[in-house]
Structure formats: structure tokens, C-alpha cells
């Protein structure tokens, strides 16, 4: 009874305070995300199966994507997309297909795409445009494996793509 009274008092105070109501709304709206983060912290997050790799991506195809991106952005002939060192792009692409004992380090398309984004942004294989190129290759990899816009809508918004890329 005493705990119920305390809870009622807290709820009453929240309803009277606009800032508290706003915080409560945020907490309720993102409760699932907070639970997932808590499960991760406790080591209880279950790794989703993901989608098996259907189509292998290679460095030559990545270069084609980079050329198309440069053309669409009007930056052909600039430093954009120029490879800084020989083999840098190949290393990034090969890394997403690495494994040990016949087991892929990144078994799903989603994990491979995310790691390709990470490696291109972090390793800077290009003189300019690594974030744009990495995010474009990420989307291309998902699309070529049927995971981008199956229903005509993209599951990744522009804002999400920017946030993912900048968090690398």
C-alpha cells in the first residue's frame, strides 16, 4: 500500500510537470531500445541470424560504384575516389569475407555491409570521399543482396545513414 501511494504521488508529479512528462514519453517511446542496450551490457543480447550472403562483392565492382557516385556528384577528375595506396580497397573488401576454420567472421550480409562501411571510413583507402564512398558501398552491398527497399521503401533513412557513417 505504501509503495502504491508513493508511485501514485510520483505519477501525479510527473503529470503536473511538462519536463517530466516529456522525459517519461521519451522513455516509454524508446523502452525497447533501452531494454536491448541493457541486454547488451549484461552479455545477454542474442545475435540475430541475419541474411546469408547471396552475392559476393569484389573490388572491381566497388570501383564501378565509386565511379558512378563521382559522376552523380559531379566530382570526376578530382581527388574523390582516387585510391591512396595500391591494394587498400581490396584489403577492405577481402576483410569482410575473412574467417577461420571455415566459419565466416561476418556470416550475414548485414554484418559484411556494416564492416565494409567501417573499414572504408576508418582505413581511408581513398584520397577524398571515404565517408560518402563507404556509405554508398554499404547501401550497394545491401541492395545487391535484396535487403534495401524490398517493399519500395528503404529501411535506412538519410539521417540514419549519416548517423551510422559519422559514428564510425
Describe each PLM feature range.
Residues 1-168:
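FIC/Doc superfamily catalytic core
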